[in-house]
């Protein structure tokens, strides 16, 4: 699971199925509910904490760390694999509350693309099959009730040109943004941008973000520095002369 997290950026967690009572669910902790973590730390939870639980109680602190009760051991033969996405702010609050910031929570608190779960799951299955060819998958549950909506932004090409100091055609902008996964459509001067899911978690949300992407891909070093020219028609007073000295 750690390898998959490092390879994809998506945390995963494995439970020993033989130590799970009934069904696995995601729920808020009961006030004062106890949990012993993998690292040996015992927590007294609050109702603000999101947990992974079975029919008998809490088995993991969602997005932070699993519990000791159902941890994977050398003799484990049945595994439940969790590949999940959690709300960033809640995970950060929980990790800070218990002074237990982990590799998983550090990623979740930055708002991970939910679509990345598929990538992490596919890699996990590939590794299971390579390492344990006799493995059998006996069930799959997929809950995605509110799919992430891709951000959509309207930007005028003339607006980009004024700020970047470059004449831009639709082809110029498309050449810079489409390789990054952006979908573009043009209507005269207006450009409609559909942001890919992996950039729709708050990273790209306003037209200034689009301008930054175009400038970045164009290359900041390719923008020529030009001095600001202006004229001063007012009389020079004594204070101005004193400041010049």
Residue ranges and their predicted role:
Residues 1-241, 245:
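RNA/tRNA-interacting regions in translation and RNA-turnover enzymes
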């Amino acid at each position: 699971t750690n390898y998959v997290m490092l390879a994809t950026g998506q945390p995963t967690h494995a439970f020993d199925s033989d130590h799970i009572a009934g069904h696995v669910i995601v729920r808020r902790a009961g006030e004062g509910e106890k949990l012993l973590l993998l690292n040996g730390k015992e927590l007294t939870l609050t109702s603000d904490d999101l947990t992974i639980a079975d029919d008998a109680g809490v088995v993991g602190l969602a997005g932070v760390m699993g519990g000791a009760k159902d941890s994977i051991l050398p003799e484990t033969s049945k595994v439940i694999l969790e590949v999940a996405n959690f709300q960033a702010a809640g995970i950060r609050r929980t990790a800070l509350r218990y002074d237990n910031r982990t590799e998983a929570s550090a990623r979740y608190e930055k708002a991970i693309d939910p679509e990345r779960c598929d990538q992490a799951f596919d890699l996990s299955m590939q590794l299971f099959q390579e390492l344990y060819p006799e493995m059998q998958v006996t069930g799959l549950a997929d809950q995605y009730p509110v799919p992430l909506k891709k951000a959509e932004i309207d930007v005028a090409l003339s607006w980009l040109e004024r700020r970047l100091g470059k004449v831009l055609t639709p082809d110029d902008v498309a050449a810079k943004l489409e390789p990054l996964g952006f979908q573009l459509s043009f209507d005269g001067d207006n450009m409609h941008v559909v942001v890919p899911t992996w950039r729709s978690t708050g990273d790209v949300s306003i037209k200034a973000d689009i301008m930054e992407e175009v400038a970045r891909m164009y290359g900041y070093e390719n923008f020529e520095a030009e001095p600001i020219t202006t004229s001063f028609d007012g009389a020079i007073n004594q204070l101005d002369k004193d400041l010049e000295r």
